């Protein structure tokens, strides 16, 4: 794991850990020369089965994000691939996931979430999905759920975690792998019902 206070690639000073998933840890880092904060996603090779396959997926994820430019999507600024770790340097998104917002609402005896806000979030999601689906090579996100949507302090959303995204390939009959979150995944994500497509993200 990266240590707090260490400097990555000679320019990113690690400030603190801000998140952790199954295979990755996310840190807040500062580029002192540019005086700008970034998020660094670290995936360590040790303890990961078949890292070659995982690495291939990470490269695909970063290549997809680097090809996109939309205000509701994070930007990747650097990829550092060495013998021990795979690091992705990207925009630091301040705020909470919609999943956290919903949980906090329930925990505080129904703290209201206003209809106007829900409509705004829905419009923004439609905007970013339309952008993804109308690329020259359409991008299918495949894991649209509240946990993957960040709500920033200004009310704008940001769709994060493109680990399951794929390029839609005309002529394919099935996805090569079945990915998605139970409870959100569309029938075709379980195999045997055709490849995932724009309608898959709408179903999610």
Which residues does each predicted region cover?
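Activation segment signature within eukaryotic-like protein kinase domains
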Residues: 121-122
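Conserved short submotifs of the Hanks-type protein kinase catalytic core
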Residues: 83-97, 101
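Protein kinase catalytic-loop region centered on the HRD/HxD motif
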Residues: 126-139
């Amino acid at each position: 794991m990266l240590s707090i206070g260490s400097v990555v690639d000679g320019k990113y000073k690690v400030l603190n850990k801000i998140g952790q998933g199954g295979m990755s840890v996310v840190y807040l880092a500062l580029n002192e020369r540019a005086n700008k904060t970034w998020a660094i996603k670290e995936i360590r090779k040790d303890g990961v089965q078949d890292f070659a396959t995982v690495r291939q997926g990470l490269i695909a994820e970063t290549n997809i994000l680097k090809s996109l430019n939309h205000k509701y999507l994070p930007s990747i600024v650097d990829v550092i691939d060495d013998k021990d770790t795979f690091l992705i340097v990207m925009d630091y998104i301040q705020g909470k996931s919609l999943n956290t917002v919903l949980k906090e609402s329930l925990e505080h005896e129904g703290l209201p979430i206003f209809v106007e806000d829900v409509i705004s979030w829905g419009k923004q999601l439609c905007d970013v999905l339309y952008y993804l689906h109308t690329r020259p090579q359409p991008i299918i996100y495949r894991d649209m759920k509240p946990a993957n949507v960040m709500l920033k302090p200004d009310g704008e959303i940001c769709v994060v975690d493109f680990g399951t995204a794929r390029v839609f390939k005309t002529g394919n009959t099935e996805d090569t792998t079945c990915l998605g979150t139970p409870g959100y995944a569309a029938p075709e994500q379980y195999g045997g019902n055709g490849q995932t497509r724009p309608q898959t993200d709408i179903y999610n």
